[in-house]
Regions:
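Membrane-proximal helix-turn-helix segments that form the acceptor-binding/catalytic region
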Residues: 166-169, 173, 201-220
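Nucleotide-sugar donor phosphate/pyrophosphate-binding loop at the beta->alpha transition
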Residues: 178-181, 191-212, 252
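N-terminal subdomain of nucleotide-sugar transferases
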Residues: 12-17, 21-27, 31-105, 289, ...
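Nucleotide-activated donor-binding/catalytic signature segment of Leloir-type glycosyltransferases, i.e.
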Residues: 299, 304-338
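Carbohydrate-associated surface elements
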Residues: 226, 246-249
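Conserved donor-binding/catalytic core segment of Leloir-type glycosyltransferases
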Residues: 47, 259-277, 283-286, 440
Length: 460
């Protein structure tokens, strides 16, 4: 073994720890201490691992919380418990009340703020193999083991949800410990994620860790066909056959009818900007429109709601625009974000420049529930494909003139739509309904049932 191989092996051991002895018990009915059945042995008993769950205000928390809430199963959950994020605000006050248990495991990063930024930049492996939540894995495993013993809950299927990808490292340990079928759900790519800062050794280790998860999981779930192709192309055909696509979802019951009374035409973007995902293509397009016709945006209000780095807030392309044309707003609670969507005339999806983007943002799926026209400033890929099927305007962020033309047309169409006294919800209902949580949760339920049928467990 070479020195380089030894370093990689040591790094992986430090991330994973010693393997756990595999249990031989599979699909046995749960018993209370007195021997009476506590849980229905004929039902799906799911153990879910998701660091991010409501009330944390992460898109992942909202999406996975919604999916678990709509699953017809007995569910025990292990999740994170930190003060690093705002709360969803109005997602569902009763979330988690139907769970068998919710084990919230406290985690506080060792470094925060500027020291953490420096460490990410200069310290090898810091928060990169796979992420800053790695120390949470063993704490969560210990807490979960105790909770399973206390409740006598014996799960017959394990589901892990990443991001963060440390959830899947916990999945590896639980798969070895419990010996039950395992579904690994990826909301984003892991080792191939273009938003990950490239560092050779960390990337190599992440590829090895991802490979272990893909090899040991019984099913792999991703949120777009493009992600499936990217992730699974490097694996044997037998592993690829374990993978499938399950989209994000929206809940139509959470939206309210528009209540606006002002006369301005509102164009909104809701979501965070970071990395290469930037509002600059929008700013440049607005400048092109104003240069061609200074009056063309009269009566138009543009709002960007969410976090934005200072380098983008101070960008010269924004400073070149008239004061008051673009309003920057901080992140709002989830329920309020849905209200803002419904009270918009045009919603924006913006992604970073790329030859092919595998990302299908959950915010885009939330937009579908609002029934409001959408403009995509996105490269070719998952978002562009969906928007094209919906006959939305789409422009590549690398082409300022194309973005300006699409924006001009989308605003004109939105203005015309406002004049209609009884506008129907925007979007082909046959396509939009495929992202309704009722249909998405039913598809996931079938996936779980099929897996358990293949492995000898209950399918209800």
């Amino acid at each position: 073994m070479t020195v380089g191989q030894s370093a990689v092996s040591l790094a992986i051991f430090m991330v994973m720890g010693a393997p756990q002895r595999k249990s031989r018990k599979r699909f046995s009915g749960s018993k209370a201490s007195g021997g009476d059945p506590m849980y229905n042995s004929n039902r799906v008993r799911m153990l879910a691992v998701s660091y991010a769950l409501p009330p944390a205000l992460f898109p992942q928390a909202i999406q996975i919380g919604r999916l678990l809430t709509h699953m017809p199963a007995e569910i025990g959950v292990v999740c994170g418990d930190s003060d690093e994020s705002a709360t969803t605000g109005g997602f569902d006050p009763g979330f988690g009340q139907g769970f068998v248990f919710r084990e919230s495991v406290r985690y506080r990063p060792s470094l925060r703020g500027f020291p953490a930024t420096l460490a990410r930049r200069f310290v090898p492996f810091f928060a990169r193999v796979p992420d800053e939540y790695r120390p949470w894995v063993r704490r969560a495993e210990a807490a979960l083991t105790s909770r399973l013993r206390e409740t006598a809950f014996q799960p017959n299927v394990l589901v892990t949800f990443g991001e963060p990808m440390s959830d899947h490292l916990l999945g590896l340990r639980l798969k070895a410990r419990l010996g039950i079928p395992w579904i690994a759900h990826f909301s984003d790519p892991w080792a191939d994620n273009p938003f990950r800062r490239y560092e050779y050794l960390a990337t190599f280790v992440n590829r090895r860790l991802e490979q272990q998860v893909v090899q040991n999981a019984d099913r792999i779930v991703v949120t777009s066909q493009e992600t499936l192709d990217l992730m699974m192309s490097k694996y044997p055909p037998a592993w690829r056959r374990k993978a499938c696509v399950l989209s994000h979802s929206f809940d139509p019951s959470l939206y309210r009818a528009p209540t606006r009374t002002d006369g301005s035409l509102v164009v909104r973007y809701l979501g965070n900007f970071y990395g290469h995902r930037s509002p600059v293509p929008l700013f440049r397009a607005l400048k092109l429109l104003l240069d061609a016709d200074p009056q063309c945006l009269n009566g138009v209000a543009i709002e960007l709601v969410g976090q934005m780095p200072a380098r983008m807030r101070l960008h010269r392309s924004l400073r070149a625009l008239p004061n008051g044309l673009v309003l920057l707003r901080d992140t709002v609670p989830y329920a309020e974000s849905l209200t803002l969507m419904s009270n918009s005339d045009l919603l924006l999806v913006i992604d970073g420049p790329d030859d092919l983007s595998v990302f299908l943002p959950s915010k885009l799926i939330d937009y579908l529930g609002a029934g409001v026209p959408i403009l995509g400033i996105v490269p070719p890929g998952a978002s562009a494909e969906l928007l094209t099927r919906l006959h939305a305007r789409v422009a590549d962020p690398r082409e300022p003139k194309a973005v300006a033309a699409a924006l001009r047309s989308a605003i004109a169409e939105a203005a015309q739509r406002r004049k209609s006294p009884r506008s129907e919800p925007w979007g082909d209902p046959a396509i939009v309904d495929g992202y309704n949580i009722t249909n998405v949760s039913a598809a996931f339920s079938r996936l779980v049932s099929d897996l358990l049928a293949d492995t000898g467990g209950p399918t209800q």
